[in-house]
Amino acid sequence: MFRDSPREPTREGVLRAARKIAALLPPTPLLPIEIGGVRVHAKADVLQPIGAFKIRGAWHRLTDLTPDEAKAGVIAVSSGNHAQGVAWAARELGIAAAIVMPADAPKVKLAATRALGAEVVLYDRAGGEDRDAIANALCDERGRVLVHAYADPWVIEGQGSMGIEISAQLGQEPSRIIVCCGGGGLTAGLALACPLSAIHPVEPDGWDDMKLSLERGEIVRVGPNPPKTICDAIQTPSTAPVNFAVLKGRAEPGVSVSDAEVRAAQRFAFDRLHLVVEPGGAAALAAALAGKVPLDPATVITLTGGNTDAEQFAAMLTATA
């Protein structure tokens, strides 16, 4: 399923990625917020140019391509946010990009990826098509580099740049970071960036493969008939060896959240922080609000993406909780 990783991600790589990101983009805000009588902080990566943290890993990976690799172009797999990150970086660097995306991805994400100039190759997620097999075949056919959404050491390091920013803004490493977790790219990156912080991955109910993997000490895939979830951005069947090697024995036990808890978190972020946060980007906040992770004043919650269809978001806000 996953191609062998060419190397392991390192904290030195995270620091190098952070310097590259700092030269390109301003830090996203670290916002104080009170939950259950405790003042914590929320890292608002919803305010990145593409509306999500994925720009970090994409920029670090594409700027490390060799001249021949850059000339050939890249392939990526994504439900939307990594797609936009790769497309944005590719446009800035003049690199061709083709993105394998599920046909049922939010329309706003499909449109934004195409608007950034990337080729979009659709696959049937609901029908069980193997997105990684499609991407690997395209790489072999076109002689391109695969920029995996999470199973890539450069991507992991790039996502970890968020942790370097957080520590600088907070004036210390956080006591704990509550992380929206799909494949584990951001989770692993933050574990490398903040070695003194407890790392709490949060996944949708029924898509909690990281939680199960950490419990059993080996990679576990989502079951054959997982439930539907509104958290499309972190709807991932399994983590990858390169991510799990970082997180095994390092991350705290994972937790999962329901769609109702996620919607409550989206409303909370809109009401208290005046931010539009997509379902997958609100999972960590949902866990905090539901009391599933302990909080203290040095806790940081990641708000990882804000790319959601306007009509669906408006309907969610006005619906009875």
Question: What annotation goes with each model-predicted range?
Answer:
Residues 1-321:
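PLP-dependent amino-acid enzyme catalytic core
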